[in-house]
UniProtKB/Swiss-Prot annotation:
Cited NCBIfam families: glyS
InterPro entries: DALR_anticod-bd, Gly-tRNA-synth_bsu, Gly-tRNA-synth_heterodimer
BP GO terms, sorted: arginyl-tRNA aminoacylation; glycyl-tRNA aminoacylation
Catalytic reaction(s) noted: tRNA(Gly) + glycine + ATP = glycyl-tRNA(Gly) + AMP + diphosphate
Protein name: Glycine--tRNA ligase beta subunit
Species whose genome carries this gene: Streptococcus pyogenes serotype M18 (strain MGAS8232)
Pfam families: DALR_1, tRNA_synt_2f
Keywords carried by this UniProt record: Aminoacyl-tRNA synthetase, ATP-binding, Cytoplasm, Ligase, Nucleotide-binding, Protein biosynthesis
């Protein structure tokens, strides 16, 4: 008869960002534990709040399934001595399995007999197996952990309670310094310690103590309450998904409410107000029906609506202090001169091993000028790039960015416009930080994109040059994100800038502040980001083939990978790749100094292939270019069927290899076809 299992771990307040991943991890680890221990179950449901992680298993078998295993031992000739008795080898084998020689039987495998024993293990009761479930809790991993009291162990937060129930029976076990029971804790202020009656009554028992254990239910409550406020007040609330996920992990019993602030603060840039509310106070932003910011906010209380007016006033007071700061900095920063702030950047360290921000900007300016030419920017855009590169970090020394560092670049754009800078320059100051996340927004202007590329390239080359190279998952300077940004920007704008040649040219530059080094490591790092950008849709062999192409032009490489993936599902892919692969492999033996001499052709197939290669222009999209190369497959096959490439005559051999080398030099601009797998 199946049962339901409940495990709840009661802890001190968890960081909000840890709650959801830990809830998921607990469920996955318990499922693995049960499967490995042969305890079948129907379903697993997880729960979490800031002060607990829990999981309930439904339909858990009351005992393990029986286990029958066959074990192969030594060959019969080794298992028996001269007298036909079991040898020490055979006796040791069965003893290691907990059996006797009576269990031995011989089975023939590939013409020879071997010792076999069959071991039967009866399943243990679930209750007995579950005594080891603390292994699941011990194996949990967290981004941070801590010691408490005089204990030698560490965990994400101090553990206060452990509840393990099999239906309504409490199992006795120990974890860290806690003995399990059926006592859980209610809401910190509204509830008390409570007894969990059974695994099935878990949610109801906690609800009576003002705890909503199901995170999804808490989220639905928050959204429903906000929607009610929208209708009652005739407003729109920005329900930011990330903020919602954070807030639901800050509360155990949510109650949403609306507060207000003086309309005078709306004169401060919207980004400042939104940052103050959303990032610093975890408030939802309120707008009118036209989408304009209103002097209101929505927050979520960890509790019921008792004395809610006092809660609203308290939250309003805290927010006003933030808004006062924003208003002050907005007013005072406008008195500053951009030139003065830029001059002071010589005293701001970019990194102690690399130098100042001013030096970083100087290098970026040189790189930006080179990129502007490569990207064929107009004269006006080139001028804007140069001006932006001279000043683009100035806002880091403003009071606003000092207080709200999330606004770097955003405030730079606003202050630049107020100072009379060209709009393209101001926009580039904001856009040079983009993308600021893996799937974040990209620059929309060419000027901003070039500045972003230049800034990221110098950052990458500078850190690599002083040996600060990411290893494993460790990337404290976000160089992977910066390089992924380089790849995404190049692809987005379709700039066909050969990265290998670009990086070579950057390493030829001379700066007093820094000498670029470790070029090979930089190129491998960029290749790894292009590889990642190709995505899971492209199999490993296709990614490797594209990465080994003769051109390192990001948009073309990504397009080639996509085209190869689509082509791999067609009928002519296998024969085309196989003929090209044969050509690639033979071409490796070609003498690079030998040019094709048509006078040495001995058959029509040589002439036909050479003419086809000469006519191969590889125009159009990556898919069209691939189609043009694949169209040569019959011609290549005819050539191989009628021509001895590795002829005894050295001149003929070299000439035929030269034909293939010409083919490969063109085809390899798409991919190294001999790296593709057709099996």
């Amino acid at each position: 008869m199946s049962k339901n299992l409940l495990i709840e771990l009661g802890l001190e307040e968890l960081p909000a960002y840890v709650v959801t991943p830990s809830e998921k991890q607990l469920g996955e680890r318990l499922a693995t534990f049960l499967t490995e221990n042969r305890l079948s179950f129907e379903d697993i449901q997880t729960f979490s709040t800031p002060r607990r992680l829990a999981v309930r298993v439904s339909g858990l078998a009351d005992q393990q399934t029986d286990l029958t295993e066959d074990f192969k031992g030594p060959a019969k000739k080794i298992a028996l001595d001269a007298d036909g008795n079991f040898s020490k080898a055979a006796q040791g084998f069965v003893r290691g399995k907990g059996l006797t020689t009576d269990a031995i039987e011989f089975r023939e495998v590939k013409g020879e007999e071997y010792v076999y024993v069959t071991k039967h293990e009866a399943g243990k009761p679930a209750k007995e197996v579950l005594l080891g479930v603390t292994e699941v809790l011990s194996a949990m991993t967290f981004p941070v952990s801590m010691h408490w009291a005089n204990n030698s162990f560490e965990y994400i937060r101090p553990v206060h309670t452990l509840t393990v129930l099999l239906n309504d029976e409490a199992l006795e076990l120990d974890f860290l310094d806690i003995h399990s029971g059926r006592v859980s804790r209610g809401h910190r202020f509204l509830g008390t310690e409570t007894t969990i009656t059974s695994a099935d009554s878990y949610e109801a028992d906690l609800r009576s103590q003002f705890v909503i254990a199901d995170a999804k239910e808490r989220q639905e409550m928050i959204v429903e309450q906000i929607k009610t406020l929208e209708v009652e007040q005739g407003v729109q609330v920005d329900i930011d998904e990330d903020l919602l996920n954070e807030v639901l992990n800050l509360v155990e019993f949510p109650t949403a409410f609306m507060g207000s602030f003086e309309a005078k603060y709306l004169d401060v840039p919207e980004e400042v107000l939104v940052t103050s509310m959303k990032n610093h106070q975890r408030y939802f932003v309120v707008r009118d029906q036209a989408g304009h910011l209103m002097p209101n906010f929505v927050s979520v209380r960890n509790g019921n609506d008792q004395a809610i007016e006092n809660v609203i006033k308290g939250n309003e007071k805290v927010l006003v202090a933030r808004l006062e700061d924003g208003e002050f900095f907005w007013r005072e920063d406008q008195k500053l001169q951009i030139a003065d702030l830029v001059a002071k950047l010589t005293n701001v360290t970019f990194h102690e091993k690399i130098g100042s921000l001013a030096e970083h900007m100087d290098r970026t300016r040189v790189i930006a000028a080179s990129l502007a030419k490569e990207a064929n920017l107009s004269a006006e855009e080139v001028t804007a790039v140069d001006r932006a590169a001279q000043i683009y970090k100035f806002d880091l020394l403003t009071g606003m960015v000092g207080e709200f560092d999330e606004l770097q670049g955003i405030m730079g754009e606003k202050y630049a416009l107020l100072a009379g800078e060209d709009a393209a320059v101001a926009t580039a100051i904001r856009e040079h930080y983009l993308p600021d996340a893996a799937g974040g927004a990209l620059p929309e202007t060419k000027v901003g994109a070039v500045l972003a590329l230049a800034d990221k390239l110098d950052t990458l080359l500078s850190f690599f040059s002083v040996g600060l190279i990411p290893s494993g998952s460790n990337d404290p300077y976000a160089l992977r994100r910066a390089t992924q940004g380089i790849v995404r920007i190049l692809d987005h704008f379709g700039w066909r800038i050969p990265m290998d040649k670009l990086v070579d040219s950057l390493y030829d530059l001379s700066f007093d502040s820094l000498t670029y080094a470790n070029k090979a490591d930089v190129m491998n790092f960029i290749r790894a980001r292009v590889d990642k950008m190709m995505g899971k849709a492209a199999p490993k062999d296709i990614r490797e083939a594209v990465l080994e192409s003769s051109t390192f032009v990001v948009p073309e490489m990504l397009a080639a990978a996509e085209a190869l993936v689509k082509a791999s599902h067609t009928e002519n892919y296998k024969p085309a790749v196989e003929s090209l692969s044969r050509a690639f492999n033979l071409a490796e033996k070609a003498d690079a100094s030998v040019q094709v001499d048509p006078s040495l052709f001995e058959n029509e197939q040589e002439n036909t292939l050479f003419a086809a290669i000469q006519g191969l222009t590889l125009a159009g999209s990556a898919a069209q270019q691939l189609e043009q190369v694949f169209a040569l497959s019959p011609v290549i096959n005819d050539f191989f069927d009628n021509t001895m490439v590795m002829a005894e005559d050295q001149a003929l051999k070299n000439n035929r290899l030269a034909i293939l080398s010409d083919l490969v030099s063109k085809a390899k601009t798409i991919a190294a076809f001999n790296q593709l797998n057709t099996k």
